UniProtKB/Swiss-Prot annotation:
InterPro entries: Ribosomal_uS8, Ribosomal_uS8_CS, Ribosomal_uS8_sf. This is Small ribosomal subunit protein uS8. One of the primary rRNA binding proteins, it binds directly to 16S rRNA central domain where it helps coordinate assembly of the platform of the 30S subunit. Keywords: Ribonucleoprotein, Ribosomal protein, RNA-binding, rRNA-binding. GO terms for cellular component: ribonucleoprotein complex; ribosome. The keyword Zinc-finger does not apply. GO terms for molecular function: rRNA binding; structural constituent of ribosome. Belongs to the universal ribosomal protein uS8 family. It comes from the Bacteria. Part of the 30S ribosomal subunit. Contacts proteins S5 and S12. NCBIfam families: PRK00136.1 (NF001109). Gene3D superfamilies: 3.30.1370.30, 3.30.1490.10. The keyword Ribosomal protein applies.
């Protein structure tokens, strides 16, 4: 039983990245799909797709990791900020920058998932899901 599915997703991506795997499979959900979409738009992963597995009711989100031409990892780190035991909410002016703006903070707002830059631009606050650099 997984208590925090987003932390589990981040851990699977981090571990696969450390082992230089080409892809990683995580149980699928709408929130995880939204996070994968942001990671792809920001260039941290190369692609993602939803796969259905026979004899299972839940589909799988397959994330294709991205590496440089020299084989180095593009995604240096990924961290969960708001946890199920301690939710972190920030207003649009208090949204944190990851590594001085070099990374991306993922925020869940009333308008859906978005990056910290989009939230500041639209002047929307929300729950800080995690950060990527």
């Amino acid at each position: 039983m997984i208590i925090d599915p987003i932390s589990d997703m981040f851990t699977r991506i981090r571990n696969a990245n450390l082992k230089l795997h080409e892809k990683v499979d995580v149980p699928s959900s709408k929130l995880k799909l939204g996070i994968a979409k942001i990671l792809k738009e920001e260039g941290y992963i190369s692609n993602y797709e939803i796969k259905g597995i026979e004899n299972q009711t839940q589909s799988v989100l397959r994330i294709h990791l991205r590496y440089t031409s020299k084989g180095k990892v593009v995604l240096q780190g990924i961290k969960r900020i708001s946890k199920s035991s301690l939710r972190i909410y920030k207003g649009h002016s208090d949204v944190p920058r990851t590594i001085g703006g070099l990374g991306v903070t993922i925020i869940s707002t009333s308008k859906g998932l978005m990056t910290d830059g989009q939230a500041r631009k639209d002047k929307i606050g929300g729950e800080v899901i995690g950060c990527v650099w």
